[in-house]
Amino acid sequence: MSDATLAADPPRLYLASASPRRRELLLQIGLTHTVLRVPAPPGEDEPQHPGEAACDYVRRTARDKAERGQAWLHSQQLPDLPLLAADTTVILDGIVLGKPADRADALRMLAALSGREHEVHAAVALCHQGRLYEDVSITRVRMRALEQAELQRYCDSGEPYGKAGAYGIQGLAGAFVSHIAGSYTGVMGLPIYETAALLRSAGIAVP
């Protein structure tokens, strides 16, 4: 199934993600789109393969999402438009921090990130006219040292859940970040510079 955007202009691409942040970022650069709700495969997030580099892992998961979306698109006989997928992963000491399973997991991740620098890898994959285009942005983020009471209040807000690394830089956790080097929109979940470059390389005009 698909959900049309509220924008009056006809959609120019499919977004294989239900993330409201990714939707907002696409609309921010004038890209009307339709959210393609692709049935998720069984199980949780795709695990990192033994020996697989974090950058390769996030690239693979974005590619898999795009390819599943393309297959679903064809199975539903929907109009053929470019299809965009993305994946974001937080990396600390070479270890992938995915979405927290529960409050204890969120507290564990946030405590590990406190006072330290980590990386956010954001991959985008575009399927268009039988070709796959992909790229990854890598951003370094430093969090200030956080008090246990702050972590508890943050978890009380509900914001950590459903987010890689248990935080969202565009929300309350923005006050935790002391330094960022790279793509702010990549940390949000969709690196706009890389996304626009992929679209242009596929011959799709970007405002």
Curated annotation (Swiss-Prot):
| Residues annotated as the enzyme's active site | 87
An example GO BP is: nucleotide metabolic process
Where would you find this protein in the cell?
Cytoplasm
A GO MF label: dTTP diphosphatase activity
Enzyme nomenclature, EC number:
3.6.1.9
Q: Which reactions appear under catalytic activity for this entry?
A: dTTP + H2O = dTMP + diphosphate + H(+); UTP + H2O = UMP + diphosphate + H(+)
Q: What is its main location?
A: cytoplasm
Q: Please verify whether the record's keywords include Hydrolase.
A: yes
Which residues make up the annotated site Important for substrate specificity? Answer: 21, 88, 170
> SUPFAM superfamilies from the entry?
ITPase-like
Q: Which cofactor does it need?
A: a divalent metal cation
Q: Which CDD domains match?
A: Maf (cd00555)
Pfam families, per this entry?
Maf
Task: Check the record and name the Gene3D superfamilies matching this protein.
Answer: 3.90.950.10
Cellular component per GO, a single term:
cytoplasm
Name the source's superkingdom: Bacteria
Family classification: Belongs to the Maf family. YhdE subfamily.
Question: Which NCBIfam families would you find in this protein's record?
Answer: maf
HAMAP family, per this entry?
Answer: Maf
Tell me the function of this protein: Nucleoside triphosphate pyrophosphatase that hydrolyzes dTTP and UTP. May have a dual role in cell division arrest and in preventing the incorporation of modified nucleotides into cellular nucleic acids.
This chain's protein is named dTTP/UTP pyrophosphatase
- Organism the protein comes from: Bordetella pertussis (strain Tohama I / ATCC BAA-589 / NCTC 13251)
Q: What is the lineage of its organism?
A: Bacteria, Pseudomonadati, Pseudomonadota, Betaproteobacteria, Burkholderiales
